[in-house]
Amino acid sequence: MTTATAPTGILLGSFTPGTPEWNEARKGLCVTATQIAAIVGLSPWQSAYELWHKKAGRPTAPFTATPEMRWGSRFEDDVAEEFAEQHPEHPLLTTGTWKHQDRDWQRATPDRLWGNRLVEIKTATHSAEWGPSGSDIFPMHYRCQITWQQDTLGLHEPAHLAVLILPYDYREYVVEYDETDARMLREAAERFLRSVRDGEPPEIDGSEHTYNTIRVQPDRYDPVDVEIPGPIASDYEVIGAQHKAITEQYTQAKSRLLAALGTGKNAMHLGRRIAYRVANEDGTTKQLQPAR
């Protein structure tokens, strides 16, 4: 493993998210740590197709922060404080936006610096993708993000990932730098940026982010007929019928499970939670959520 004692990346500055300066540091043909997972198809927040259209200056659907994102920002300082209390060996410092010393297009904004290591801070609403504290089990898109940060700043010492799984389950993970993974991400980013320059968008995938991006591309409405190719028409009709059938089957399965759950909260099977009930104040069911 290659190590570094100080960042070799170039600090562009510390910017408040959402400000013109913050947007300036991220705009154009560059790839940030929060974007790399989308490029390799692992981001739950964005598809490569949507990101491509943003980079190409084409329309995209308006961004709306989810409650999970908003609360994650609010809890960030609290989680950082817990990490600092448990690890007093070095001060835990806020930092800014960096670019790679040789690759101007490679950008990252880590949450904190701790000595010569990065610290990324998260919150989560459930523990399904998170292993025990100290394990190597956590969401893959965060691994992409942290690897990109390590590679951008040149800090190849193991990074730390601190997460608060709501309401009060605090866990930590150590993320080793992997040069093979970093090279794979760089190559994917270079191909992606080249496709933007060449005007060749990624293939259409099944993400809602991709669908919503396509939805806002038309700038007018022409009352005309358009002949659709056979494979596209067939997929739409056949898969649409299958979707209707499976939706009805799934609704039936939910109804049966909810009836079996009664007034309870967690639906268990052989010691494993498979769903949980969210109740209104009067005890009636507001939602039945799958365990994730």
Model-derived features: positions:
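Accessory terminal regions of nucleic-acid processing enzymes
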Residues: 1-292
